[in-house]
Amino acid sequence: MRSVRGRSTATAALVAISLLALPSGTTATADPAGAATLVVLGDSFTATAPVLGHADDGCARSPNSWPNKLATSTRLSGTAGFVDVSCNGGTIDTGNGWTLVHQTRKAHAQGAFGSDTRAVLIQAGLNDIWGASSGTAFPSTDCLLDIVEGCGLDAAEQNRLPDYHAVTGATYADRVREVVTFVRYYAPNARVALVGYPEIFPPGQPAACMDLAVVGRVVQPRAEGYIAYLDRLQDAQRAAAQLLGIEFVDVRAITAGHASCSEEPWISGLAGADSPFDGAPVHPNAQGNGAVAVQVRQRFGL
């Protein structure tokens, strides 16, 4: 049970986000009954956003995303017990799109958070700007798919990749703290977790391999910077979770050995079974999402 002092601290910290989170004329009430069991916030790795998909809210989500597979296996799919506000291009706080604050506001407006909420899962950070560099990891045309200049350790200095040196646990924790505090206050019984990213490319190697439609197999021989960024983000999420007193779901460990171009890849290309109506290249495929859903269900007892 959370102490009164803890709740007072949370209330003070919530002032700024509450102004954004509540629709006009709505009164905030902590611990509302009848909230969602499972709430998910995230980006395209969460939504597995189809390249050619469409949704009324502008955030297409594949039936094969790990949240949808999780909801189906727990019989929450199609019920008020499951709220997924993840969106392609979602960020922690970069840009004016579906940041975590915007997603939290959207979920709160749907009555997602309350004393009945059991798990709130947050997967974000890959699309954000880090440090002095204005570069982003996605879209990848400025770096990962630039065969001429590559995506080496100098890419961040050239604003073609986030500054991986700036990706730390303390910085990550500071950027998500407001949302985590809000969730803890309005869903006091929920287990809150940062969800990591899958093994996109094997760590510790200089090159990155991708299977793309028409083009075929593409190898970026200078991908040290991109892979370093993925490694730093993994470490930062784990450390941030510890600093915030929440959980970390190590998706990289779950998907180890199934990187892009492996014998059994769980990272999609854009051909065959990896339909543009189902997902995006260099994103999780149905098999990878299924494995994550199974592990998350077991861990959180859903």
Pin down the residues of each PLM region.
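Secretory targeting and sorting signals
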Residues: 1-31
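Short amphipathic alpha-helices and their capping/turn segments at secondary-structure boundaries
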Residues: 25-38, 99-120, 178-191, 297
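Serine-esterase "nucleophile elbow" of acetyl-processing enzymes
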Residues: 29-89, 140-145
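A structural motif corresponding to the C-terminal end of an alpha-helix
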Residues: 71-78, 174-193, 229-250
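Catalytic His-Asp segment of secreted/periplasmic serine-dependent ester chemistry enzymes
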Residues: 198-302
